[in-house]
Swiss-Prot record:
<feature type="transmembrane region" description="Helical">
    <location>
        <begin position="301"/>
        <end position="321"/>
    </location>
</feature>
<feature type="topological domain" description="Extracellular">
    <location>
        <begin position="171"/>
        <end position="173"/>
    </location>
</feature>
<feature type="transmembrane region" description="Helical">
    <location>
        <begin position="410"/>
        <end position="430"/>
    </location>
</feature>
<feature type="transmembrane region" description="Helical">
    <location>
        <begin position="444"/>
        <end position="464"/>
    </location>
</feature>
<feature type="topological domain" description="Extracellular">
    <location>
        <begin position="222"/>
        <end position="264"/>
    </location>
</feature>
<feature type="topological domain" description="Cytoplasmic">
    <location>
        <begin position="121"/>
        <end position="149"/>
    </location>
</feature>
<feature type="topological domain" description="Cytoplasmic">
    <location>
        <begin position="535"/>
        <end position="575"/>
    </location>
</feature>
<feature type="topological domain" description="Extracellular">
    <location>
        <begin position="1"/>
        <end position="15"/>
    </location>
</feature>
<keyword id="KW-0739">Sodium transport</keyword>
<feature type="topological domain" description="Cytoplasmic">
    <location>
        <begin position="465"/>
        <end position="471"/>
    </location>
</feature>
<feature type="transmembrane region" description="Helical">
    <location>
        <begin position="265"/>
        <end position="285"/>
    </location>
</feature>
<keyword id="KW-0472">Membrane</keyword>
<protein>
    <recommendedName>
        <fullName>Sodium/mannose cotransporter SLC5A10</fullName>
    </recommendedName>
</protein>
<dbReference type="InterPro" id="IPR001734">
    <property type="entry name" value="Na/solute_symporter"/>
</dbReference>
<dbReference type="Pfam" id="PF00474">
    <property type="entry name" value="SSF"/>
</dbReference>
<feature type="transmembrane region" description="Helical">
    <location>
        <begin position="576"/>
        <end position="596"/>
    </location>
</feature>
<feature type="modified residue" description="Phosphoserine">
    <location>
        <position position="145"/>
    </location>
</feature>
Length: 596
């Protein structure tokens, strides 16, 4: 395998300094300290305490955890790599989250809290009845967690450590998994959220330092556009334009038919996929469900949205600068050159961020950036482990063992994390053999093929009282068949390298995966609507407090029994959140317009 045979070609010759080792040691010590502190203060001896932090979490750790959970090492490496390869447009994946995060807190969370659920499949069972949809969603979420989220973060983190330090791939990955699992098992969601808050601070500080040094290398932001346009490798493929940076690299909105990230797909298709991730995926929603009241959930979403503005300047633009500074490595197009630079023939854009770290960061700060990547990896993995444990315990094990007590459920929840560790370690050889240039595309393709049907049943379930179990199930099945067919075709007919004729079937060649997400969403909605109208309507208990139109009115101010706030104080903070949300959207629109 290319990744194995050339792995030593790009291992750094320099050794870690004592200062670097001290910085990394301090980082791990802080993690252990925060983990022990939060584990000791957390109520982890009940199901609600372990899986939902006792529903007593404040807004600031929720917001930090929402951000940290979504910014794993896969996004650090992937966003910088996509920026190096194609420019700014990939920032849309981050900025689109603003509107969906607000929808989570203002629309979805009131429904979820009023329904008194622990997992999202549990809500679907209450809303539609029956067990088959809940089981399907739980299994689907577990599969997506293991084979997309964990795999991408592990690969990207291991790639970074290998390039920067030359550490053994297996040893560093297993050590990271062990540390992550230790404090996740010990303290539950509260520990995960508080350590995520620490990771967020470390990630932002380290990324800011590297971004400032990168911009200084090229003379500031004003020089980026001209410098990026000239970032051409010395060796190119004759009679092709593969080596040329995109002409629309500095623009967010790209042509619907010829753009690599068409504006239609980034506006509508991405919103469908983002709604699944931010509003219906257990990993994310679990943080908002832990809020002490709805106002804290709203404030957490607002904080996370502001933080999601940062990756443009902290990851994507530094990735573009990396191509400017190292065009022969980051921008390589000749397979033999790419093999030399990073061990992958298809391209080396994914080494953009670690390359910057190794070339620009001095002794000490290099250790800080290694800690940053470890922070990104740990925060993402802890989130996935805790949420996957919750899904299996509450949606699968409790159905197999209805008489299971709280002690048994807590034990099973901890054992599931151990099993996930084993599966993750077993997946490492597959990751090493995978093409590093395709990981980010692989993740998005899988999401576009499997997520839209889930988004559809949640949207219709919340906003359409007539939707029932028959319609939801057959809508899901129709979406699964069509989405799985697309996935199979993508694996059978991979996208050809630049410079080769595209002979893939027309549905793959002509239909962008973001546009496919739109079509799949509409298909699922149509089948679900038809199935619901052709079968009996849902019972009253399946819509009471379970749809937007049947929600109890006291949830409009974020009331929660026992939160210790007067109605006047709740109303005041609700208005503060509303004003902040409007201001946030104005800031987001300004940035979109500026980089349009």
């Amino acid at each position: 395998m290319a990744g194995n045979s050339t792995g030593d070609a790009h291992v750094p010759g320099s050794q870690l300094s004592v200062t670097d080792i001290i910085v990394i040691s301090v980082y791990f010590a802080l993690n252990v300290a925060v983990g022990i502190w939060s584990a000791c203060r957390a109520n982890k001896n009940t199901v609600s305490g372990y899986f939902l932090a006792g529903r007593d979490m404040a807004w600031w750790p929720i917001g930090a955890s929402l951000f940290a959970s979504s910014e794993g090492s896969g996004l650090f490496v992937g966003l910088a790599g996509s920026g190096a390869a194609g420019g700014l447009a990939v920032a849309g994946f981050e900025w689109n989250a603003t509107y969906v995060l607000l929808a989570l807190a203002w629309v979805f969370v009131p429904i979820y809290i009023s329904s008194e659920i622990v997992t999202l499949p549990e809500y679907i069972q209450k809303r539609f009845g029956g067990q088959r949809i809940r089981t399907y969603l739980s299994v689907l979420s577990l599969m997506l967690s293991v084979f997309t989220k964990i795999s991408i973060d592990l690969y990207a983190g291991a790639l970074f450590v290998h390039i920067c330090l030359g550490w053994n791939f297996y040893l560093s990955t297993i050590l990271t998994l062990a540390i992550t699992a230790l404090y996740t098992i010990a303290g539950g969601l509260a520990t995960v959220i508080y350590t995520d808050a620490l990771q967020t601070i470390i990630m932002v500080v380290g990324a800011v330092i590297l971004a400032v040094k990168a911009f200084n290398q090229i003379g500031g932001y004003e020089q980026l556009e001209a410098a990026y346009a000239q970032a051409i490798p010395s060796r190119t493929i004759p009679n092709t334009t593969c080596h040329l940076p995109r002409a629309d690299a500095m623009h967010m909105f790209r042509d619907p038919s010829t753009g690599d990230l068409p504006w239609t797909g980034m506006t509508f298709g991405l919103t469908i996929m983002a709604t699944w991730y931010w509003c219906t995926d257990q990993v994310i929603v679990q943080r908002s469900l832990s809020a002490r009241n709805l106002n804290h959930a709203k404030a957490g979403s607002i904080l996370a949205s502001y933080l999601k503005m940062l990756p443009m300047g902290l990851m994507i633009m530094p990735g573009m600068i990396s191509r400017v500074l190292f065009p022969d490595d980051v921008g390589c197009v000749v397979p033999s050159e790419c093999l030399r630079a990073c061990g992958a023939e298809i391209g080396c854009s994914n080494i953009a961020y670690p390359k910057l770290v190794m070339e620009l960061m001095p002794i000490g700060l290099r250790g800080l950036m290694i800690a940053v990547m470890m922070a990104a990896l740990l925060s993402s993995l802890t989130s996935i482990f805790n949420s996957s444990s919750t899904l299996f315990t509450m949606d699968i094990w409790r159905q197999l063992r209805p008489s299971a007590g709280e002690r048994e459920l807590l034990l099973v929840g901890r054992l599931v994390i151990v099993v996930l560790i084993g599966v993750s370690v077993a997946w490492i050889p597959v990751l090493q053999g995978s093409n590093s240039g395709q990981l980010f595309i692989y993740m998005q393709s899988v999401t576009s093929s499997l997520a839209p049907p889930v988004t559809a049943i949640f949207i219709l379930g919340i906003f359409w009282r007539r939707a029932n179990e028959q319609g939801a199930f057959w809508g899901l099945m129709a979406g699964l068949v069509v989405g799985a067919l697309r996935l199979v075709l993508e694996f059978l007919y991979p996208e050809p390298p630049c410079g080769q004729i595209d002979t893939r079937p027309a549905p793959l060649r002509s239909l962008h995966y973001l546009h496919f997400a739109i079509a799949l969403f509409l298909l699922t909605c149509a089948v679900m609507a038809a199935g619901s109208l052709l079968s009996p309507p849902p019972q009253q208990r399946q819509i009471e407090n379970l749809t937007w139109w049947t929600l109890a009115p006291n949830w409009s101010l974020g009331t929660k029994t026992g939160d210790g706030q007067t109605p006047q104080k709740r109303a005041f903070w609700a208005r503060v959140c509303n004003v902040n949300a409007i201001f946030l959207m104005c800031v987001n629109i300004f940035f979109y317009a500026y980089f349009a």
